């Protein structure tokens, strides 16, 4: 019997714009719509801020793993979502971080003293310095190299571009291979659908396209991006 992947808290974006002299929220029904609003407001010089929830996932294997707990506001919903599945949050022993950007890490405060698997390049990255208080609450297990196995049927590969130590998780399920690609895939779903990024996307453009091709060649049943709904490919 294969493992399973479930979304505990789905991705969403909350964008704020300067309107009438103060910050106002801009409603969006999906994370992708929120990103388009953000791009438009940025071009108009009206962005006041954006908060982005990543997909927080549960992998059910020989052990249960929480993947990318997310920003601090996701902590309570994640715990409630686990409880609704009959899993008490205190029974979760291991958490996996695809990378160590703050929007994927903050809610680790819900899982103190757990073993946290994260690539060593992320632990050493300068942006983790202001998260040190959170990381000090857990037991870091550094992953190294370009690939590895966490347990049979649960592997990881390094997929840099968005972050040098970003890993994608490869999970064997009864429906086929599921890839939790995190922020390797995004920020809009049509980019991955079309395997194309705007020419002015940024310095990571070519690396991301290489990683997308690599993911496609794995022939996955489903890909879970960081900030968009899962994509079923067959």
What does each model-found stretch correspond to?
Residues 10-12, 64, 68-72, 100, ...:
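Active-site metal-binding loops of divalent metal-dependent hydrolases
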Residues 36-56, 60-94, 139:
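Pre-active-site segment of Zn-dependent metallo-hydrolases
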Residues 106-112, 234:
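Metal-dependent catalytic neighborhoods of phosphoester/phosphodiester hydrolases
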Residues 6-10, 57-60, 145-174:
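Core dinuclear metal-dependent hydrolase active-site scaffold
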Residues 80, 92-103, 110, 115-158, 164-234, ...:
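Metallo-beta-lactamase
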Residues 1-62, 211-214, 219:
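Zn-dependent metallo-beta-lactamase
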């Amino acid at each position: 019997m294969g493992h399973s992947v479930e979304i505990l808290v789905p991705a969403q974006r909350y964008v704020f714009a300067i309107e009438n002299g103060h910050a106002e929220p801009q409603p969006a029904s999906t994370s992708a719509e929120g990103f388009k609003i953000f791009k438009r407001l940025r071009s108009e010089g009206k962005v006041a801020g954006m908060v982005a929830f990543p997909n927080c996932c549960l992998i059910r294997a020989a052990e249960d793993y929480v993947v990318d707990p997310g920003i601090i506001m996701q902590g309570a919903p994640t715990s409630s979502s686990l409880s609704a599945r009959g899993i008490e949050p205190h029974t979760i022993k291991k958490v996996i971080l695809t990378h160590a950007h703050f929007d994927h890490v903050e809610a680790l405060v819900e899982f103190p003293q757990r073993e946290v698997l994260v690539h060593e390049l992320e632990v050493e990255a300068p942006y983790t310095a202001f998260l040190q208080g959170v990381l000090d609450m857990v037991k870091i297990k550094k992953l190294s190299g370009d690939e590895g196995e966490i347990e049979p049927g649960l592997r990881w590969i390094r997929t840099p571009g968005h972050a040098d130590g970003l890993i994608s998780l490869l999970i064997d399920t009864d429906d086929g291979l599921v890839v939790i690609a995190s922020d390797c895939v995004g920020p809009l779903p049509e980019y991955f659908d079309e395997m194309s990024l705007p020419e002015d996307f940024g310095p990571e453009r070519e690396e991301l396209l290489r990683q997308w091709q690599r993911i496609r060649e794995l022939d996955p049943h489903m890909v879970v991006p960081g900030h968009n709904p899962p994509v079923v490919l067959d």
